[in-house]
């Protein structure tokens, strides 16, 4: 949400699409974080309808760069086998539809994916090869000084360096980057 707010504040046209939370929950979080830039929000799970919504938002503000934020990939359905059939293959086909849409319209997508109980990316490994960057967010459980902080790491980046690590603390108004020296 903070990223969607920042992108909108910097002149972007952003749709935050979630099936993980209700729009009411999303609104409450936006208010708590005091996000002010008014990005669009939706709850579409069917990718063809989602992309139609994207077209409408892009047409309303054609001069602004468009960013689609999806929370999460595993809740989307490409519609190939009906509206209620969601599985790993559905996620692959949905991601393919989104990446093809972005390539053909010069839009950008940030797709949030789920993880398994042991912290691995949910779904097939092919998903990693379909994206330009893979960024993980985890909870620090080993270092006593950073216990409970979030670790943001780049695992893959086609356009720059990977293996970058950032430590984030969760504050009342969202994430705040911290350095190891600031917590000791």
Predicted regions, residues:
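Conserved inter-motif catalytic segment of the P-loop NTP-binding fold
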Residues: 2, 10-100
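Aromatic pocket-lining residues of Rossmann-like dinucleotide-binding sites
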Residues: 7
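Phosphate-binding/switch region of NTP-binding enzymes
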Residues: 92, 96-184
């Amino acid at each position: 949400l903070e990223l969607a707010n920042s992108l909108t504040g910097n002149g972007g046209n952003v749709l935050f699409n979630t099936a993980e939370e209700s729009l009411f929950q999303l609104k409450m979080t936006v208010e708590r974080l005091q996000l002010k830039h008014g990005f669009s929000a939706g709850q579409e799970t069917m990718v063809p309808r989602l992309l139609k919504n994207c077209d409408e938002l892009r047409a309303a503000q054609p001069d602004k760069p468009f960013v689609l934020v999806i929370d999460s990939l595993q809740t989307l359905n490409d519609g190939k086998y009906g509206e209620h059939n969601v599985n790993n293959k559905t996620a692959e086909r949905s991601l393919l539809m989104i990446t093809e849409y972005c390539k053909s319209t010069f839009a950008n997508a940030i797709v949030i994916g789920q993880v398994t109980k042991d912290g691995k990316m949910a779904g097939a490994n092919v998903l990693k090869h379909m994206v330009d960057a893979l960024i993980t967010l985890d909870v620090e459980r080993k270092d006593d000084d950073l216990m409970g902080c979030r670790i943001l790491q780049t695992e893959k980046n086609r356009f720059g360096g990977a293996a970058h690590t950032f430590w984030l603390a969760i504050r009342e108004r969202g994430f705040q980057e911290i350095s190891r020296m600031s917590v000791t």
